[in-house]
Amino acid sequence: MSWRKGIYKLPFRLNFDRFEDVYPQLKNQRFYGFKELSMAPGVNDESLIREKISGDIFNRAGIASSQTAFYKVYINFGSGLWYCGVYTMVEVVDDTMIENRFGEDDGNIYKPESDFTSFVPDKFEKKNNKTEADFSDVVSLINTLHSPLRTENPAQWREQLEAVFYVDHFMKWLAI
């Protein structure tokens, strides 16, 4: 979008483990504890602070959220530094971030493109544990959401839902 507007300010990612398969000596390479960072140009946010403020609010409320910070970005294309503007650095949700927030990284991280009416594997892209074809956590959530117990026995349905989904955490997130 910014490129079409004639603005030389594009989003980009920094992945510090990108070449660990090719160069094993780079395995688990981190930059100040981060495995991957996303640099957002904020072209749709004239204030440039929405993402930073929302992340801070979530973190202060005890809801796991990506760390954010502001950076002035300069790039050297060989003829000196080119000022690209102020970017919002956003911690990418990955196994490192999950382990830092929850003390473990055993669960799956998904980037869903689903409406959760049914389970379609192509609609749930795994961001970790990609070699394991275990989607039982998502299947269990979808089955619970659509269980007839929802109307027949709401108390039992709620109990089953809370066993597979952090309802209180979600409600807190929704409120903010």
Tell me what each language-model feature is.
Residues 1-176:
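Phosphate/dinucleotide-binding and metal-coordinating scaffold of catalytic cores
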